[in-house]
């Protein structure tokens, strides 16, 4: 059966629409249903001088693989016309509406996965809509109290205990309960979505040198080690906490199915250095599959045909592979 993958371009003034039109210039073994403004896609394809045939989405028709130069589109009107590279807060509600439709139709089983383009969080909030990120939004839509943000590239997966919070709040956010929940979700999805029978997880400490026996902080001793001990007792193979400045050595990465980082800028700089342009964001713990690009809106590139589509292609391929494991 042909898979049906929902795609949201994200910020209309950014490179999301460009990338979708670019990757549509090849055949795909799935139906790519873009939840977006048809007019926006048509205008952007002309700006890029790329051919585009739009097929109106019919949920009652059987899914068909996507042919080169075509996109299936579920039309959502822009609030106001869009100029590439120029933000307009009036379209913040449009962006959120595309995400709402995508999540609802994935929860219902109409789609097999969601692939999301980059959004501008500040603009959505400026529009009066509280929004801290895709991960948190989809968790709310799916009524999930706990989800996990993981980024992946060739040879490295990094999951985060905390995501989009100020660094000053990180230490208090890393609790015994949070470590338990995040690690269990990571372990479960590595098994069920990635087909890894016995996942091995390496965990970073939070302090320099993982606290150095409590001399540089006691979170490792008082919170992390007891949490990991209970996880091991339940059969979860987790190693750590280890110093974050040494955990990314090849000798560890060769064994690790995932690295568990305590905060956003502890784990992601290494991953993006290793695979920028070819890494993908994956949300774990949702009742549906969601992948995304690993970059921002790149407003300065919108409509110019110079944006790199590598991460979007990886996000698509990961979504297809994960959906095949369901």
UniProtKB/Swiss-Prot annotation:
**Pathway involvement of the protein, from the record:** Cofactor biosynthesis; pyridoxine 5'-phosphate biosynthesis; pyridoxine 5'-phosphate from D-erythrose 4-phosphate: step 4/5
A GO biological-process term: pyridoxine biosynthetic process
Co-factor binding details: Binds 1 divalent metal cation per subunit. Can use ions such as Zn(2+), Mg(2+) or Co(2+).
Recall the taxonomic lineage recorded for the source organism: Bacteria, Pseudomonadati, Pseudomonadota, Gammaproteobacteria, Alteromonadales
**What does this chain do?**
Catalyzes the NAD(P)-dependent oxidation of 4-(phosphooxy)-L-threonine (HTP) into 2-amino-3-oxo-4-(phosphooxy)butyric acid which spontaneously decarboxylates to form 3-amino-2-oxopropyl phosphate (AHAP).
Q: Which cofactor does it need?
A: Zn(2+); Mg(2+); Co(2+)
Q: What is its EC number?
A: 1.1.1.262
Under InterPro entries, the record lists: PdxA, PdxA_fam
| GO molecular function (one) | zinc ion binding
The UniProt annotation places a divalent metal cation binding at 164, 209, 264
Quaternary context = Homodimer.
Homology family? Belongs to the PdxA family.
Q: What class of enzyme is it?
A: oxidoreductase
Reactions the enzyme catalyzes: 4-(phosphooxy)-L-threonine + NAD(+) = 3-amino-2-oxopropyl phosphate + CO2 + NADH
Per the record, what is one GO cellular component? Answer: cytoplasm
Entries under PANTHER family matching the protein: 4-HYDROXYTHREONINE-4-PHOSPHATE DEHYDROGENASE
* Protein name in UniProt: 4-hydroxythreonine-4-phosphate dehydrogenase
Native organism: Colwellia psychrerythraea (strain 34H / ATCC BAA-681) (Vibrio psychroerythus)
Keywords, comma-separated and alphabetical: Cobalt, Cytoplasm, Magnesium, Metal-binding, NAD, NADP, Oxidoreductase, Pyridoxine biosynthesis, Zinc
Tell me what gene encodes this.
pdxA
Miscellaneous note of the record: The active site is located at the dimer interface.
Q: Where does this protein reside within or beyond the cell?
A: Cytoplasm
Residues at which substrate binds: 134-135, 272, 281, 290
A Pfam family recorded for this sequence: PdxA
